[in-house]
Amino acid sequence: MTSIADIRTDYARASLDIADVDASPLRQFRRWFDEALKAEVAEVNAMTLATVDPHGQPSARIVLLKNLDERGFTFFTNYASHKGEELAANPRAALLFHWIGLERQVRVQGIVEKVSEAESDAYYHSRPLGSRLGAWASEQSSEVPDRATLEAREAEYRQRFGDAPPRPPHWGGYRLLPERLEFWQGRPSRLHDRLEYRKHADGSWTIVRLAP
């Protein structure tokens, strides 16, 4: 049986230098994201979202990036879920993208805000019917006795709304407004390249190199 301690990979695909990156962290992220798309990285828009509850207990889960613009990173969820409750109490959060095939990570820290009703409506109505009904049927993070209960709820809302369910008031989008972004490139001998963008009050960014 292989020892977990003996599992290791040496990274050697690429390097990362301040002279080669974009002055804008969001443009740099888009550059890396497009390269991950081209490389056919699985679930390229999957990201770990970390939040903290009022007692200081952190939580993390995978969510999907659904929009990226000059303001930040957008994802959608149930506002009444554990993460929604935690973000209501403390809007500070972090994201992590891990594109293992490219030996890259991107870490993002910032403040989360709800997107507009119009943005939530537009994305909700672009989803498959089953996903739209599921947003009604699932009281996310609450206890349920069995799967049959969920399926019965889905059938109930399908009968009620047909193929035109409205967006539930408890479901919508969040946008993380980045204040720090770290781009990590795996390198040999664990001497990885780490570049961090730090946002200033005037909206400008400073780029620094961090020790691995």
Curated annotation (Swiss-Prot):
Protein's UniProt keywords contain Oxidoreductase: yes
List cofactor names only.
FMN
Keyword terms of this UniProt record: Flavoprotein, FMN, Oxidoreductase, Pyridoxine biosynthesis
Q: Which pathway does this polypeptide act in?
A: Cofactor metabolism; pyridoxal 5'-phosphate salvage; pyridoxal 5'-phosphate from pyridoxamine 5'-phosphate: step 1/1; Cofactor metabolism; pyridoxal 5'-phosphate salvage; pyridoxal 5'-phosphate from pyridoxine 5'-phosphate: step 1/1
Cofactor binding notes: Binds 1 FMN per subunit.
Tell me the GO molecular function terms: FMN binding; pyridoxamine phosphate oxidase activity
The answer to whether keyword Oxidoreductase applies is yes
Q: Which reaction does it catalyse?
A: pyridoxamine 5'-phosphate + O2 + H2O = pyridoxal 5'-phosphate + H2O2 + NH4(+); pyridoxine 5'-phosphate + O2 = pyridoxal 5'-phosphate + H2O2
Q: Which Pfam families match?
A: PNP_phzG_C (PF10590), PNPOx_N (PF01243)
User: What's a GO biological-process term for it?
Assistant: pyridoxine biosynthetic process
Which cysteines form disulfides?
none
Specify the enzyme's EC class, one word: oxidoreductase
Please name the SUPFAM superfamilies in this protein's record: FMN-binding split barrel
Q: Could you say which residues bind FMN here?
A: 61-66, 76-77, 83, 105, 140-141, 184, 194
What Gene3D superfamilies does the entry give?
Electron Transport, Fmn-binding Protein, Chain A
Function noted in UniProt: Catalyzes the oxidation of either pyridoxine 5'-phosphate (PNP) or pyridoxamine 5'-phosphate (PMP) into pyridoxal 5'-phosphate (PLP).
Q: Which PANTHER family match?
A: PYRIDOXINE-5'-PHOSPHATE OXIDASE (PTHR10851:SF0), PYRIDOXINE-5-PHOSPHATE OXIDASE (PTHR10851)
Q: How does it assemble?
A: Homodimer.
Identify its protein family: Belongs to the pyridoxamine 5'-phosphate oxidase family.
Could you identify this protein by its name?
Answer: Pyridoxine/pyridoxamine 5'-phosphate oxidase
